[in-house]
């Protein structure tokens, strides 16, 4: 991020989208080190957004929840995935496309007044 910020500062604009996690906003038993690392990404995102906002640089983070990826398939047995989905207000797991659409919006002019945001893409999981 440091080198990107130098280039963007010279240009007077830019967008940085960090990849955090739903666990940047909440906790999960047994995931202490992962949670700590993702809280750090969230803090870095917010702090850097404040420092570089006047330079025309927007910095946000996407906080995906449980997304249907190879990692989820490897780490969560199939029979547990349905139960996991049922614990989401939207009653499903996310898709990589859900995350990509959020990134596209954050990178677009439609979000021109959005910076320092930890943008949840988690089907409401962190809302409960």
Predicted regions and their residues:
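C-terminal substrate-recognition "lid" of short-chain dehydrogenase/reductases
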Residues: 1, 13, 92-126
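Active-site helix of classical SDR
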Residues: 1, 37, 45
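Alpha-helical segment proximal to the catalytic Tyr-Lys
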Residues: 6, 50-51, 112
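Residue(s) in the substrate-gating loop at a strand-loop-helix junction
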Residues: 21
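Short, flexible catalytic-loop segment of classical short-chain dehydrogenase/reductase
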Residues: 25, 42, 63-74
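Active-site loop immediately N-terminal to the catalytic Tyr-X3-Lys motif
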Residues: 26-32, 54-55, 91, 109
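Short, small/polar-rich loop/turn modules that mediate ligand/substrate recognition or access, typified
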Residues: 53, 58, 114-116
